[in-house]
């Protein structure tokens, strides 16, 4: 069955998208270094990479890097609200099949992913680049005939990695996978520093709210939660954290945050951010006892953290204030302001993480794709991480842009520490 060569909101936005991509390239030194280092040898030649990851300007730079390295690429977004339509148009205009636009329905979302499985020459995908696991699950559950040709997959985010480990434990994973999320240069940078900037961007664009002085509740204190708590505190918010893990709870307490339950926090906070990657974090009980016009949003991957279905079924009225901002009137007469329908607020209400930090993450993705494509015999079916030396290389590629001058170990110092002068400098279990 024939398919459209692309489907985006408006192809005439391509010129605008190209201007944004050019600016982003200058902020993404890791990806540009990959082009310079690997472009001539085309290590991804023959790879047919199907990607399902937020179709943003930064992702456009990733896609063009994969193409420069020899791959054929097809793309969809991993969230119905996260596409930047100018970026999607710019990539589609280059001939790369893109199926993504901001504001897809759930049915359109799955249709878009399905369009990327078979390439224009009739050949199916042989590599997966995923964010969240929807593409991975679709291939395993609905199109298992393609698994035999797939050399591997790389997964971007915490939620998708949880899915991979669960699949492997249950014997359902059919291909080797690289967990990009747990590269230090991804999780300790994208998850923390990226969210520290993009959360506030999303909340401010959506609501224009003054954060200073307000009580803010952050559900979860992993890397994402840490970044969100820092951001809200930095703007003068009085931050409460909720946690299930005693280690994370202790970390939050020793950073000076109040740590309590959502049952208690929901009575007091004016701004709520869920960051957990788990379901049922803010329930009907919590929503009903929030202060009037409480702002509720999520920065975890899926829309299962806030009980949006209950809100839609039980609120007296729902008013759409503007795209991705809804104000609910509760039975009590109080109001709840929900952002991005409970989906990723930083991408639904803003443009996601800045280019520089995404260069960290996406350089890991490129290296993971090269590893799996060129060294497939090295990787058995299972979930793997990139070697520490590559993690350090990713960090090194981003130092010059920030004016960082790295100290070099002397031979005597290296011998004393028992490491090479060129790394890796830390054991795999080091937590940073």
Swiss-Prot record:
SMART domains, per database record: AdoHcyase (SM00996), AdoHcyase_NAD (SM00997)
Disrupted-gene phenotype: RNAi-mediated knockdown results in increased S-adenosyl-homocysteine levels and reduced lifespan.
Pathway(s) where this gene product acts: Amino-acid biosynthesis; L-homocysteine biosynthesis; L-homocysteine from S-adenosyl-L-homocysteine: step 1/1
NCBIfam families: ahcY, PRK05476.2-3
Subunit details: Interacts with AhcyL1; the interaction may negatively regulate Ahcy catalytic activity.
Record InterPro entries: Adenosylhomocyst_ase-like_sf, Adenosylhomocysteinase-like, Ado_hCys_hydrolase_NAD-bd, NAD(P)-bd_dom_sf, S-Ado-L-homoCys_hydrolase_CS
GO molecular function, one term: adenosylhomocysteinase activity
Organism of derivation: Drosophila melanogaster (Fruit fly)
Cofactor(s) annotated in UniProt: NAD(+)
Cofactor binding note from Swiss-Prot or TrEMBL: Binds 1 NAD(+) per subunit.
Reaction catalysis annotation: S-adenosyl-L-homocysteine + H2O = L-homocysteine + adenosine
Binding, substrate: 56, 131, 156, 186, 190
Catalytic class of the enzyme: hydrolase
Keywords attached to this entry: Hydrolase, NAD, One-carbon metabolism
GO biological process: one-carbon metabolic process; S-adenosylmethionine cycle
Described function: Adenosylhomocysteine is a competitive inhibitor of S-adenosyl-L-methionine-dependent methyl transferase reactions; therefore adenosylhomocysteinase may play a key role in the control of methylations via regulation of the intracellular concentration of adenosylhomocysteine.
UniProt name for this protein: Adenosylhomocysteinase
Binding site residues for NAD(+): 157-159, 222-227, 243, 248, 299-301, 346, 353, 426-430
EC number: 3.13.2.1
A GO-annotated cellular component: cytosol
Stored Pfam families: AdoHcyase (PF05221), AdoHcyase_NAD (PF00670)
HAMAP family named in the record: AdoHcyase
């Amino acid at each position: 069955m024939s398919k459209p060569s692309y489907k985006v909101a408006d192809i005439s936005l391509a010129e605008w998208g190209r201007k944004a991509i050019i600016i982003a390239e200058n902020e993404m030194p890791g990806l540009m270094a990959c082009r310079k280092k690997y472009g001539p040898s085309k290590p991804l030649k023959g790879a047919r990479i199907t990607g399902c990851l937020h179709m943003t300007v930064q992702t456009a730079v990733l896609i063009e890097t994969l193409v420069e390295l020899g791959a054929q690429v097809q793309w969809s977004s991993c969230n119905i609200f996260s596409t930047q339509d100018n970026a999607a148009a710019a990539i589609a205009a280059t001939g790369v099949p893109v199926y993504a636009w901001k504001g897809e329905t759930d049915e359109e979302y799955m249709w878009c992913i399905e369009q990327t499985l078979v390439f224009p020459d009739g050949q199916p995908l042989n590599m997966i680049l995923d964010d969240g696991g929807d593409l991975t699950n679709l291939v395993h559950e609905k199109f298992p005939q393609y698994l035999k040709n797939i050399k591997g997959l790389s997964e971007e985010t915490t939620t998708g990695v949880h899915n991979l480990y669960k699949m492997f434990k249950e014997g359902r994973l059919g291909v080797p996978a690289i967990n990009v999320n747990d590269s230090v240069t991804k999780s300790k940078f994208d998850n923390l520093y990226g969210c520290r900037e993009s959360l506030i961007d999303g909340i401010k664009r959506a609501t224009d709210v003054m954060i200073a002085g307000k009580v803010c509740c952050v559900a979860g204190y992993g890397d994402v939660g840490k970044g969100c708590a820092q951001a809200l505190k930095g703007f003068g918010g009085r931050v409460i954290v909720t946690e299930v893990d005693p280690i994370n709870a202790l970390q939050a307490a020793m950073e000076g945050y109040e740590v309590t339950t959502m049952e208690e926090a929901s009575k007091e906070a004016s701004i709520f951010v869920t960051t957990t990657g788990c379901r049922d974090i803010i329930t009907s009980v919590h929503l009903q006892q929030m202060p009037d016009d409480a702002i509720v949003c999520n920065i975890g991957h899926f829309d299962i953290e806030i009980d949006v279905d209950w809100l839609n079924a039980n609120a007296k009225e729902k008013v759409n204030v503007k795209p991705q901002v809804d104000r609910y009137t509760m039975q009590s007469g109080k109001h709840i302001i929900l952002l991005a329908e409970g989906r990723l607020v930083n991408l639904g209400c803003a443009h996601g993480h800045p280019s520089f930090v995404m260069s960290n993450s996406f350089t890991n993705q490129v290296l993971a794709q090269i590893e799996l494509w060129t060294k497939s015999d090295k990787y058995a079916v299972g979930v793997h991480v990139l070697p520490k030396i590559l993690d350090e290389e990713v960090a090194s590629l981003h130092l010059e842009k920030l004016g960082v001058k790295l100290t070099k170990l002397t031979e005597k110092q290296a011998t004393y520490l028992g490491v090479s002068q060129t790394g890796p400098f830390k054991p795999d279990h080091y937590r940073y």
